[in-house]
Amino acid sequence: MLQFVRAGARAWLRPTGSQGLSSLAEEAARATENPEQVASEGLPEPVLRKVELPVPTHRRPVQAWVESLRGFEQERVGLADLHPDVFATAPRLDILHQVAMWQKNFKRISYAKTKTRAEVRGGGRKPWPQKGTGRARHGSIRSPLWRGGGVAHGPRGPTSYYYMLPMKVRALGLKVALTVKLAQDDLHIMDSLELPTGDPQYLTELAHYRRWGDSVLLVDLTHEEMPQSIVEATSRLKTFNLIPAVGLNVHSMLKHQTLVLTLPTVAFLEDKLLWQDSRYRPLYPFSLPYSDFPRPLPHATQGPAATPYHC
């Protein structure tokens, strides 16, 4: 009985207009269940981008802030949902090492070359007779045993260190690099790379204000969609590099301290990287990195009965 009296007194003493934690939680739950009602009431929608590709049922999209480069104070303009299979994978450092070493060596060519005893000038005459002198027997002064002679088992360049990693390993390396950058708060998503001015000093001061570090890699969808202001600003800065989305690689992400992506770039990366998980195994070598469909037969005719692709 005493408990009921105390509960009634607390309810009577509560000021008008105040809400308990339970009621606030119920309102937040109703807002998440009915986002259309929240939008109809005039409240801004915080999520600017939704994941277009299907997400596994046991996982949820990862959220990141969407920022803007148009001002120092416009640091956060909304949220973006990121696919967990691209931006929240297991941090496989061994995969990062494999892909980084592959990028370092697959274009490496060593031009080191030494001459054998047949290529060294001279040495055609036997230095002394085989017997009778008491010296060790030799047949040429250009033997590898002699000073100035040829080299045995030396490098015979040019030597190529080319090898190819499986495409799915390379795609996994990009996923791991994006995941690590996001986990370390070194990945920033922008609504656009548009700057109010093309002065490089503005970009350096903005990066210093937001604590991006000394080196920044900015990625846009294509060269044609890059704003002229960001092109002018990065062209005069050595540590700020601007590349298209198709050129994003593990080496560049590890080399730069901060990675900046646009919303169209995020959609492009999710589409291309998740396609590697579900594509069929090719029976022919790829002609392009992202074209897996065979080309039409040269003798195929136009019409419904024509076979457009190889079987």
Swiss-Prot record:
Assigned GO CC terms: mitochondrial inner membrane; mitochondrial large ribosomal subunit; mitochondrion
UniProt KW keywords: Methylation, Mitochondrion, Ribonucleoprotein, Ribosomal protein
Annotated compartments: Mitochondrion
Positions where Omega-N-methylarginine occurs in the chain: R147
A Gene Ontology biological process term: mitochondrial translation
Region Disordered, annotated ranges: 118-149
Primary subcellular site in the record, as a coarse category: mitochondrion
Single annotated GO MF: structural constituent of ribosome
Position of the signal peptide: none
Pfam family, any one: Ribosomal_L4
NCBIfam families from the UniProt entry: rplD_bact
Subunit note: Component of the mitochondrial large ribosomal subunit (mt-LSU). Mature mammalian 55S mitochondrial ribosomes consist of a small (28S) and a large (39S) subunit. The 28S small subunit contains a 12S ribosomal RNA (12S mt-rRNA) and 30 different proteins. The 39S large subunit contains a 16S rRNA (16S mt-rRNA), a copy of mitochondrial valine transfer RNA (mt-tRNA(Val)), which plays an integral structural role, and 52 different proteins. Interacts with MIEF1 upstream open reading frame protein.
Protein family (similarity comment): Belongs to the universal ribosomal protein uL4 family.
Stated name of the protein: Large ribosomal subunit protein uL4m
Organism name: Homo sapiens
